[in-house]
């Protein structure tokens, strides 16, 4: 019985925490879909296609592949060249 009460309180706490820490829980989906539709009509408008601030091949990146323009990082940004 005690375990059940603890589980119920934990679930309620986590659910409340999720809504409290959300950026915009009221109009989040309402504003999300028009933006997505706009990006489908105009792929150039997508922020995912922009790689501002990425590092070129040969630049030190540590172990974070998101820093490289080519998305391949093994201490330095790597670009694979197709020979065929």
From Swiss-Prot:
The modification Serine amide is found at residue 83. Expressed by the venom duct. Disulfide bonds join 54-69, 61-73, 68-77. It is found in: Secreted. Keywords: Amidation, Cleavage on pair of basic residues, Disulfide bond, Hydroxylation, Ion channel impairing toxin, Knottin, Neurotoxin, Presynaptic neurotoxin, Secreted, Signal, Toxin, Voltage-gated sodium channel impairing toxin. GO terms for molecular function: sodium channel inhibitor activity; toxin activity. It holds the Pfam family Conotoxin. One of its GO terms (cellular component) is host cell presynaptic membrane. Residues 23-49 form a propeptide. The modification 4-hydroxyproline is found at residue 65. InterPro entries: Conotoxin, Conotoxin_d-typ_CS, Conotoxin_omega-typ_CS. Residues 1-22 form the signal peptide. Delta-conotoxins bind to site 6 of voltage-gated sodium channels (Nav) and inhibit the inactivation process. Belongs to the conotoxin O1 superfamily. The presence of a 'disulfide through disulfide knot' structurally defines this protein as a knottin. This is Delta-conotoxin-like MVIA. It comes from Conus magus (Magical cone).
């Amino acid at each position: 019985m005690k375990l059940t009460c603890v589980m119920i309180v934990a679930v309620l706490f986590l659910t409340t925490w999720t809504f409290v820490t959300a950026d915009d829980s009221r109009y989040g989906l309402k504003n999300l879909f028009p933006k997505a539709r706009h990006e489908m009509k105009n792929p150039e408008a997508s922020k995912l296609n922009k790689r501002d601030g990425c590092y070129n091949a040969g630049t030190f990146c540590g172990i974070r592949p998101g820093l490289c323009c080519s998305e391949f990082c093994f201490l330095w940004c790597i670009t694979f060249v197709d020979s065929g």
